[in-house]
Amino acid sequence: MISAHILSRQATRPGHRGPRFTTHSTALLVQRSLGQGLPLAHRRTTRAWESTSSSTASTGSHKESGHIETAPHESLLFFNNLFPLKLSSILIWRPWTSEDLLQRFEQSSYSFIDPIRLVKRAINTHDQVPIEVTQIIPRLKDGGAFVKFTHPSDMSAAVVESKLSELLQNNPIKPWFNPFGRVKAGLVEGVPWLEDLYRLPRSRIRVEFVAAKDDASPAELSQETLYSIFRKFGKITEITSQPTDSKVLPRFAYIDFVLVRDAIMARNCMHGFVLREQGSKNATKLRLSYEQRVKAHHIWAWFTSHPRIVIPLVAALIAAFTVAVFDPIREFFVKAHVQKYFEFTNSRLYKWFKSQTSDILAFRRRKTEDAGLNALFTHRKDLIDSIQTGLLESVDTFTVVHGPRGSGKKELILDQVLKERSNVLHIDCKPVVEARGEAGTIGRLAFEVGYRPVFSWSNNISSLVDLAVQSTTGVKANFSENLESQVVKILQTTASALKQVGLSERKKEDKDADLSEDAYLEAHPERRPVIVIDHFLHKSEEKGVIYDRIADWAAALVQSNIAHVIFLTDDASYSKPLQRSLPDRVFRSVTLGDLSPDVAKKFVISQLQTDTKFAHDGQQKDSESGDQDNDNKNQKKDSNTPAPLDPTLLKELDTCITALGGRLTDLQVLARRLKIGQSPRKAVQEIIDSTASDILRMFLLSKSSTSDRKYTTEQAWYLISHLAASPSSSIPYNSVLLSNTFASSPETALEALANAELITVKSQNGMPSEIKAGKPVYQAAFQKLASDEKVKARMDLLVLTELAKMETQKIEKVEQELVMLQGLMARRPGDVSERVEYLLEKMKGGQARLKGLEKEMGVVKGQMVKG
């Protein structure tokens, strides 16, 4: 930073013995500053700040060398606290120099705050100090100024400093920017370095010990010596010597001052100071510079040194922030999903448009479906009324609707039981369980309940962070969450939103407005939302934890009177997981079976009566006359009157429905085939053929690894063949367990086949009693497969081969035991002879059975060759 040369003014009043000035220009400038002896125009044109030195070279010497030259009987004083310390950092990129800045001060209307005037006041107001000021050099960066002065030969510079400091102590001069501070003066004992580098003052001083002469070695000063030298400038907090094992040269020490102003005074007064310690031959020069103090950062150091505490704490804070910010948003979206805020079909505009156009636009397909379902729901009206009545009661238990797939569970509950309910949450477990990966599962579950925003991808990133933290610190940060915890979080947020939904219709004018929220929900079961959990226990062996958490969540909802819960499942073992979540409770179970032949026939007829192809004259053919077409056109005019069906068609339906059974999905397929012009007999036959083909592909000719299935192809064929040959369309459960084909894990195999819906296990008094086909059409498909000679021969060969393999293994075990007993026969024949005879008889019987199996295999192979 380039320093300006400042002229101090001289007092002009008579008898004044203040500082004197050495040049004529000095007097002129003093007169100018006092406003005397010069005309106004001259006062305006005279430069404000000029050097009092007579030599131009000496004037700019410190600008080039960075040092101030002094003559004999000439010394330097440093005045502190004249400028704000931050001024230099603010003006670091200023386009003007220090001289320009000081000229702006004087020429402006704010010249009364000129910092150089403080120096003049400190010097000129005290006639006790007989000095002559020759030069004033401001230091904006250090917040002070150097004053060069001459003193009488009989008075030392130290005495001048002492008197001046005493006067400033008794008559303090306070700067305008710091009314609580005061100007201080110190004698410059060294050689100050006037640099203009960007080195801002600090409270820490680095003192380097260098040799006063090039050929000498410096001495390292002790802390006591440094304290005695620098204590006069201000309070010192710490003196740190260089470590003894350090090889850094030159040797140094750190001195920490309490105030930055004290460090500035010490640096400007003692830089270049030369001293000689007692007993030392060589002199040591002190070279001072500001040093950035490394802050302790105790809090950060504690955090980094205690990762076992800090990392879980940070994770907890992040979780708390997430809950505070995102949970209210997610609860809002769940409420909107349940109450259907954003669905267009729930808007007033759509409802008005639908009411205005319902008599004009005919939605034929929907009308056809409604006709068939209405016939079905009329048959099940008692079940519908029973479930609706249960939703009006305050009973803390589940409602479970069980039935085989395709029995109409979802349509019964959503389209009939909950038709008039507005607050219904439908959760389909099938897409949740079938989703790929944890992120997909969480995303699907969040979609089902309306939980958003959801950052399912963030858990993968959190897992990587956990891995990185654990590998570096050895502590698991627990930023990531497992699948179970994420499912619980979504369900808890959903429960909170459902409670708000149940309380949304509560008003202050109600008679029971003084009740608590829980008491209100208990007293008004009709206000609670209804949760329908569809496809419960679908593929439960893959992601059973999801079903466990859903069951626990549903149990908490019904026990807290927050919502009614209805489970829809086709798994007969639904009671096990539900009993774990809600023990000591009796569930409201509703079982939907296959329709009886009469109801099934009515269902198909109701589907067909809405289609004009099945009018009184029979099925239309390509050769029908135009008169019949006109009759059909006349019948279309009255769409509300069911069209009578052809009697021939009705007779065929009686026999075909008996073979097809009463499964709702199969009846719908039959109705669609009849609508496209197929006869009932042909439609049923094609359904049976398609079903048999599916069974053959999925259970008998499947190329999937046997390790992925809990049953074998031979076991599936055993059940198919025996059910096809059974007059009652069923086989005893225990007879299957005792068969050789099911010798290994029979119950596991039967359970797997039941879950695959190939068979149905009927129970009596809680115990499995008989086995039937998975659905009625399967029985006809089994008979078709068993009557196919090629399929039967191939499957029988597999069964015989497996049985022969089992007999061979039994014989090999007997042979191994006989070899072991051979040594004992020679020593103690009486003890082992009975066992040997038993094994020989067993081996004989096994060999006979093996021979018979091989004979049967030969016959089957012959049939396959002929076929």
Curated annotation (Swiss-Prot):
Residues 42-308 are mitochondrial matrix. Keywords: Coiled coil, Membrane, Mitochondrion, Mitochondrion inner membrane, mRNA processing, RNA-binding, Transit peptide, Transmembrane, Transmembrane helix. GO terms for biological process: mitochondrial genome maintenance; mRNA processing. Residues 1-20, 44-66, 614-647 are annotated as: Disordered. GO terms for molecular function: RNA binding. Its main location: mitochondrion. Residues 330-867 are mitochondrial intermembrane. Residues 203-293 form the RRM domain. One of its GO terms (cellular component) is mitochondrial inner membrane. It comes from the Eukaryota. Residues 48-59 have a biased composition (Low complexity). Residues 1-41 form a transit peptide. The chain crosses the membrane at residues 309-329. Residues 614-639 have a biased composition (Basic and acidic residues). The keyword Transmembrane helix applies. InterPro entries: Mt_escape_2_C (IPR018850), Nucleotide-bd_a/b_plait_sf (IPR012677), P-loop_NTPase (IPR027417), RBD_domain_sf (IPR035979), RRM_dom (IPR000504), Yme2_C (IPR039627), Yme2_RRM (IPR034260). It is a single-pass membrane protein. The keyword Transcription does not apply. Residues 797-857 form a coiled coil. Plays a role in maintaining the mitochondrial genome and in controlling the mtDNA escape. Involved in the regulation of mtDNA nucleotide structure and number. May have a dispensable role in early maturation of pre-rRNA. Belongs to the YME2 family. This is Mitochondrial escape protein 2. It comes from Neurospora crassa (strain ATCC 24698 / 74-OR23-1A / CBS 708.71 / DSM 1257 / FGSC 987).
